[in-house]
């Protein structure tokens, strides 16, 4: 199970001040570019990609439609993704599939898409259908993050992940229940076929994230013979 650490600089100065040594144990860096205004993203990008050249990088613009910090038209969203991809070739590109379906055809040139769905309110009853639709598109990664209201929601997500992975062994899935209630899904995702877990340094990018140092220790225990 790979550990992903989000970074959320709000300025070039904050990006330059990130201390590389603090990310020891992380496998992937997710750059949450939505903490910048749209005109600053390309200005800050060189600092991010140079500093974290030794890591895999996920480029993410999480818009307000799915719990993020920036409002963009479909055109602005696609243009920013394509501009960053053309210059820096991030290892993964996050795409908010269900809120941007109308422009998904403009993403077909990318083989490294993380098709994502985020719901900070609930675990929807049609979660299986959502997983199925994204899986059928065979992206690099299918990512789902939902909010549980009870323990059964957490178990349902984990069970669905296990089932989809069993029937689609070549597809990478990244799934999590958010908040304290859903923390188990972040710790035991590898058991059911979720390839990544997200951990934090100072600030979390989603409810329920575990600190990087703690997650590294947990992974060490789980991976031990």
From Swiss-Prot:
EC top class, as a word: lyase
MF-aspect GO terms: 3-dehydroquinate dehydratase activity
Domain of life: Bacteria
Catalytic activity: 3-dehydroquinate = 3-dehydroshikimate + H2O
Listed InterPro entries: Aldolase_TIM (IPR013785), DHquinase_I (IPR001381), Type-I_3-dehydroquinase (IPR050146)
Positions contributing to 3-dehydroquinate binding: 30-32, 62, 186, 205, 209
EC number: 4.2.1.10
Gene Ontology biological process terms from the UniProt entry: 3,4-dihydroxybenzoate biosynthetic process; amino acid biosynthetic process; aromatic amino acid family biosynthetic process; chorismate biosynthetic process
SUPFAM superfamilies referenced in this protein's UniProt entry, alphabetically: Aldolase
Pathway per the UniProt entry: Metabolic intermediate biosynthesis; chorismate biosynthesis; chorismate from D-erythrose 4-phosphate and phosphoenolpyruvate: step 3/7
Pfam families from the UniProt entry: DHquinase_I
Positions annotated as active site in the UniProt record: 118 (proton donor/acceptor), 143 (schiff-base intermediate with substrate)
Keyword line: Amino-acid biosynthesis, Aromatic amino acid biosynthesis, Lyase, Schiff base
Family note: Belongs to the type-I 3-dehydroquinase family.
Subunit structure and binding partners: Homodimer.
Biological role: Involved in the third step of the chorismate pathway, which leads to the biosynthesis of aromatic amino acids. Catalyzes the cis-dehydration of 3-dehydroquinate (DHQ) and introduces the first double bond of the aromatic ring to yield 3-dehydroshikimate.
Annotated protein name in UniProt: 3-dehydroquinate dehydratase
